[in-house]
UniProtKB/Swiss-Prot annotation:
Name of this protein: Superoxide dismutase [Cu-Zn]
Disulfide bonds: 56-145
Record-linked Pfam families: Sod_Cu
Compartment(s) where it occurs, according to its Swiss-Prot or TrEMBL record: Cytoplasm
InterPro entries: SOD-like_Cu/Zn_dom_sf, SOD_Cu/Zn_/chaperone, SOD_Cu/Zn_BS, SOD_Cu_Zn_dom
Chief location of this protein within or outside the cell: cytoplasm
Subunit comment: Homodimer.
Catalytic activity as recorded in UniProt: 2 superoxide + 2 H(+) = H2O2 + O2
Family: Belongs to the Cu-Zn superoxide dismutase family.
Keyword Transmembrane helix: no
GO CC list: cytoplasm
Matching Gene3D superfamilies: Superoxide dismutase, copper/zinc binding domain
Gene: SODCC
Length: 152
């Protein structure tokens, strides 16, 4: 079983830990807990670069090895890193589980060494009609991020 982890942090008081587990070539299970967010939906994506030298801004675009448009996790046309939204409760905390087949932990399209970014606003899943809908889901600013690392 492959395992990875990312510790999310920000200058805005958002923090959390996200775990990834993959059995063989099967889907990857993502489990996490993030706190310090405003209640509601927040875009949650794997970004292309594991570079936080300029905070979350240097993590690049959504991870997109297949050159597709932005979409929902269940869509055929989507970035590999499009994991949709996490739901934050009134206490500012999100606890979630996502199962996804486009974010392997090994092989040529591995997400290890890339970044996870939590956004300020909901991801419209490419359906919002905004000029950014088909690239970012119009999910707003980047409020927390971290680099995905292998876990023993």
């Amino acid at each position: 079983m492959g395992k990875a982890v990312v510790v999310l942090s920000s200058s805005e008081g958002v923090s959390g830990t996200v775990y990834f587990a993959q059995e063989g070539d099967g889907p990857t299970t993502v489990t996490g807990n993030v706190s310090g967010l405003k209640p509601g939906l927040h875009g949650f994506h794997v970004h292309a670069l594991g570079d936080t030298t300029n905070g979350c801004m240097s993590t690049g675009p959504h991870y997109n090895p297949n050159g597709k448009e932005h979409g929902a996790p269940e869509d055929d046309v989507r970035h590999a890193g499009d994991l949709g939204n996490i739901t934050v409760g009134d206490d500012g905390t999100a606890t979630f589980t996502i199962i996804d087949s486009q974010i392997p932990l090994s092989g040529p399209n591995s997400i290890v060494g890339r970044a996870v970014v939590v956004h300020a606003e909901p991801d419209d899943l490419g359906r919002g009609g905004h000029e950014l809908s088909k690239t970012t889901g119009n999910a707003g600013g980047r409020v927390a991020c971290g680099i995905i690392g292998l876990q023993g």
